[in-house]
């Protein structure tokens, strides 16, 4: 493995725990500690912990910070509070998704954008390019933050025992600042990428290992990127670089809820997104279940039963929960019909599949 890969503060911790390390977005990350299935099931039915410190953090501060983030992002950031985060997209002028991200309003003039690891530099440069007309400062503060995700049905009860705040009633994307966890000050966000209840913990980078080790003392399973991928795919959650790209809009990529083109404020890509909201997008993302043995991989062609190509698979795996072969695919809008049978070209075979809902959690 290349020595040029970036490492999170937990890299040596992974090695000591015998994790299998892979390259992901320029980082050396654990794909698994025990087995993907074991880690997947721990999160789906009990509790697991992920290191996601490779994610990027970009800070926007200054007098025009609120207007600037609204101009950059496709969702309506105007109603953000200092206790409610928002999932949104950074779009280009054609409405294509440069990145999907979560934005936190830390103060009236201070916003934290949490972006995908592989896109951090690209996003940062894009944001810098568009700041000229605004009185703002933009900083890449990724090297100041550690980020952990504790996920699963038992996560809330454990966190409630360990922090100095009551998290019982916290709802999706609510967050609290200045929470104490193992003596460290953290931002605690009710969010995740697994389809399960849980929290994302933002801490000073120097506190990452203390919190990681502290949580693992409570019979929490360490989990790698392999389980993170199968969990998000079962839940129908898109991955940027596969299901979302710069040539896919929020309406095509299945994240229409992250686009609000009817608001008064202008934002980059608004005209294209407004047209797609009113008239429909040419393509749409669907869930697929293969009806024959095989795995649908990214880029595999999707066809109607006559063999006409109507789209392609964007992500696919075998579900550890159900054992079924599941996928997300992008198809022509007019070809969509729930339950419809299609074909997927898997190597030299055409396998039958059917359109199902994107969230395929089966437990």
UniProtKB/Swiss-Prot annotation:
Function: The glycine cleavage system catalyzes the degradation of glycine.
Subunit details: The glycine cleavage system is composed of four proteins: P, T, L and H.
Name listed for the protein in its UniProt record: Aminomethyltransferase
Species assigned in the record: Staphylococcus aureus (strain NCTC 8325 / PS 47)
GO cellular component terms attached to this protein's record: cytosol; glycine cleavage complex
EC number(s) given by UniProt: 2.1.2.10
Source superkingdom: Bacteria
Family to which this protein belongs: Belongs to the GcvT family.
């Amino acid at each position: 493995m290349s020595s040029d890969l970036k490492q999170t503060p937990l890299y040596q911790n992974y090695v000591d725990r015998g994790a299998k390390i892979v390259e992901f977005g320029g980082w050396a990350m654990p794909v698994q500690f025990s087995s993907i299935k074991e880690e997947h099931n721990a999160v789906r039915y009990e509790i697991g912990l992920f290191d996601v410190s490779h994610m990027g953090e970009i800070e926007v501060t200054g007098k025009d910070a609120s207007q600037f983030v609204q101009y950059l992002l496709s969702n309506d950031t105007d109603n953000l509070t200092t206790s409610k985060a928002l999932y949104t997209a950074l779009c280009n002028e054609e409405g294509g998704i440069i990145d999907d991200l979560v934005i936190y309003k830390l103060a009236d003039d201070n916003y934290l954008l949490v972006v995908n690891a592989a896109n951090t530099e690209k996003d940062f440069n894009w944001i810098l390019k568009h700041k000229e007309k605004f009185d703002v400062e933009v900083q890449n503060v990724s090297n100041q933050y550690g980020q952990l995700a504790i996920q699963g049905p038992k996560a809330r009860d454990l966190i409630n025992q360990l922090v100095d705040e009551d998290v019982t009633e916290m709802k999706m994307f609510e967050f609290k600042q200045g929470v104490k966890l193992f003596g460290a000050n953290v931002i605690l966000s009710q969010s995740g990428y697994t389809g399960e209840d849980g929290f994302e913990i933002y801490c000073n980078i120097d506190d990452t290992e203390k919190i990681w080790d502290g949580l693992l003392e409570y019979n929490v399973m360490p989990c790698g990127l392999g389980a993170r991928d199968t969990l998000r795919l079962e839940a129908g959650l898109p991955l940027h670089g596969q299901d979302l790209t710069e040539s896919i809009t929020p309406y095509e990529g299945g994240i229409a809820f992250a686009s609000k083109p009817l608001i008064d404020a202008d934002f980059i890509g608004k005209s294209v997104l407004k047209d797609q909201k009113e008239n429909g997008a040419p393509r749409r993302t669907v869930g697929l279940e293969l009806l024959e043995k095989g795995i649908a991989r990214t880029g595999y062609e999707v066809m109607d039963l006559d063999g006409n190509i109507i789209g392609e698979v964007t992500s696919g795996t075998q579900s550890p929960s159900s054992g079924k072969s599941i996928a997300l695919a992008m198809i022509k809008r007019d070809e969509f019909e729930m339950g419809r049978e299609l074909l997927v070209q898997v190597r030299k075979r055409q396998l039958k599949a059917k359109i199902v809902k994107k969230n395929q959690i089966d437990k």
